[in-house]
Amino acid sequence: MKSRFSIPEFCLSHWLLRIPLAIVFLQQGLSKLPFSLEDAEAFDLPGLVWWFVIYGEIGAGIGLLVGGIMTKPWLPILERCYIPDIGDAITRFSGITICSIMTGVIWVGQPDSLMDVILYDNLHVFLWVGGLVFALRGNRLT
């Protein structure tokens, strides 16, 4: 006997993780502009590292959104040149960038132990895990 009810498929549920993560990284990156060496020195970082952090955060936020949009050819003109793997690669690279930045943030905090990170630095751990999800799964979260 066939059931009348079935579990709905939530094929767009990846946006529930993608949008907040992108907003956090865009907001953090844009709040660091304009670039200044004084801000870098406040965290004992070289200027070049600070520059990569700023543009890495902005790029990762934009990359998560663009990579998600590129899952389908939304415009008819894009159907001829549509390559789904490009959106997946952008999403994965953005996830790797997020993991790298969050590893640096946790490292700069100089925690005493791994338990201190897990118990008291949970926001950064959650952001790191969110980046790890997109780095490992890309656009294939469904």
Where are the language model's segments positioned?
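Extended, low-polarity transmembrane helix blocks
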Residues: 1-34, 50-142
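Perimembrane loop-to-helix junctions flanking transmembrane segments
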Residues: 38-47
